[in-house]
């Protein structure tokens, strides 16, 4: 039942999902990294004020690029990724996406 709740936020392919003691995580390894990175950044931004500049936005965009490259090269069949690499590229992407979300929120509220 828990697994069905997550079907809308992740494809949940078993071969791309971490497992612990025979139980699969509710999301794939890349999404695990993305969600963990985003949660970590939101917690950080809640505790420590962050000033968002053009450099911050550029850095956030750069953090997403490795995930794009990993996913795209796998999709095109150039190579096969693994769960550690998926998680390792998902983590900074989650941080980058969280920063971009906070910047967007700031822009919307201060227009």
Swiss-Prot record:
<feature type="transmembrane region" description="Helical">
    <location>
        <begin position="91"/>
        <end position="111"/>
    </location>
</feature>
<feature type="transmembrane region" description="Helical">
    <location>
        <begin position="45"/>
        <end position="65"/>
    </location>
</feature>
<keyword id="KW-1133">Transmembrane helix</keyword>
<dbReference type="GO" id="GO:0005886">
    <property type="term" value="C:plasma membrane"/>
</dbReference>
<dbReference type="Pfam" id="PF09858">
    <property type="entry name" value="DUF2085"/>
</dbReference>
<dbReference type="InterPro" id="IPR019206">
    <property type="entry name" value="DUF2085_TM"/>
</dbReference>
<protein>
    <recommendedName>
        <fullName>Uncharacterized protein MTH_518</fullName>
    </recommendedName>
</protein>
<keyword id="KW-1003">Cell membrane</keyword>
<keyword id="KW-0472">Membrane</keyword>
<keyword id="KW-0812">Transmembrane</keyword>
